[in-house]
Amino acid sequence: MEVWGPDTDRSDRLWVVLLPGLGGDPEHFHWLARGLSASGWPLALVDHPGSDSAAVQALLEGRQSFDGAEALRQRLADLRAVLEAQRGGQLPVPGNRVVLVGHSLGALTALLAAGAQPVAGADQRCEAALAGLPLTNLSKLLQCELAAGRVMETPVVNPLPTAVVGLNSFGGLIWPEKKSKPLGIPLLLIGGTLDLITPPLDEQLGLLAALGLHGASRAVVVEGASHFSPIRVDGQASEEEGDDLFQLGEELVGVNPLTVQQLIALELIRFLNQLEGDPAAGGMQHLSDGTTRWHRLDRSSAARLTEQLQ
């Protein structure tokens, strides 16, 4: 685990736990940790041995198998250990209000830890979802593996998070819209239009409609961004080739990943700043910086859009 101290002091007493996704390492998110700490928030960046890049590389090379349920169980235990260490003073991170930020499986971990209760009937939903190979939503395969592993019934962490931020989050089969009990804390769910692993219509917008009752909850969809856009690998900041599991082509990474990462940091910092004040204006907002377009939606606009397009 890495600890990032703030460049400046804030009065909101917020601190952040950042959880990489499956196959992710802390180094992939140094860009985000740097931006958050520069804005005044202390941060713990968690490493998850057993489901990090080394574990996935071993899986790809046939040296070990992968148990999704066990990986999630271990990630939840890692998160509880971090929170307990901070609360007990063993982790040198100031603050008494925690925000959980996770990418993909890290976001699922954060939602479960925050008290999102899986809806009964996942077996039947999975049977219907997997009747055909879900090529446009590969997360369904992992969702169904986790549902079969009976690992998602987990106690809420202490302290309860002040908010949850999900980058390329998933859970549409776990928390179906109109059947789920919403969370009472703010959610920010960020995705991209080129994400074929956790597509925003099924996953981020669906999750916001299902769980995002709080008035400050938002989804942000970035045009041209993919599932791997939040991951920065060695050499990506220049024209060099990095040596990394996620050294992927544009067709998988999406367009302008560095610009997308800047937008993610911008939206996340905006969200954290607004936790202290009134929720931002609702509805759907269409934004552009001249090179990239993105869309900000509240719960009602996300629900309308998913209903119209399904």
What are these regions, as identified by a protein language model?
Residues 199-209, 234:
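Short alpha-helix in the alpha/beta-hydrolase fold that links the catalytic acid
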Residues 211-233:
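Catalytic histidine neighborhood in serine/cysteine hydrolases
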Residues 10-13, 18, 22-55, 173, ...:
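Short substrate-entry loop that stabilizes the transition state in hydrolases
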Residues 1-12:
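Short beta-strand-to-loop junctions in surface cap/lid or active-site-entrance loops
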Residues 183, 189-191:
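Short beta-strand/loop motif that positions the catalytic acidic residue
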Residues 225-227, 233-310:
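Alpha/beta-hydrolase-fold serine-hydrolase catalytic core, especially in secreted/extracellular enzymes
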Residues 102-110:
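Gly/Ala-rich beta-loop-alpha elbow adjacent to hydrolase catalytic centers
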Residues 64-92, 121-137, 142, 150:
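Alpha/beta-hydrolase active-site loop
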